[in-house]
Amino acid sequence: MRALAPLWWTAGFVLVLDQITKVIVVQWLDLKTVGRIEVIDPFLVFRMAWNRGVNFGLFSGSSDATKWVLIAIALAITGWLVWWMRRDKPGPVIQISAGLVVGGAIGNVIDRLIYGAVADFLNMSCCGFENPYSFNVADISIFLGAVGLIFVGGDGPKTRDDADKAS
């Protein structure tokens, strides 16, 4: 378990941060009722969006089946990432990237279980570009983790000895 500490610490941090920001913005600031709060207009606006699909509302559906399929997919990806980390025991950068995905995925699963949809509230626009989409801390985390896994988590050599053997 200690070998995977970066994975678990990152996933836990992201999950807690995601859920705390949602409680503060959606519940305490009552964004679910108000709908929009201009923080630093237009650069940062809290705009409530209930996402029943994946990124940008793709594959959204109001049926219970859609919700459960998306929960199952998120949990399957989470399980696969944990299995991969346990099997390969990669370095901390890859574990942190996987932890970003795991924490974000679980945060969005919790939303689907509590609200029936993912609570998206961050909206950023700039320089005449009006962004029509809202997102949340979990979405940012999943994106950054996926980028890290793609660019750092390949099947390249794990140690200097492996690199010498490969050349």
Language-model features, listed with the residues they occupy:
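Alpha-helical transmembrane bundles and membrane-interface segments of multipass inner-membrane proteins
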Residues: M1-S167
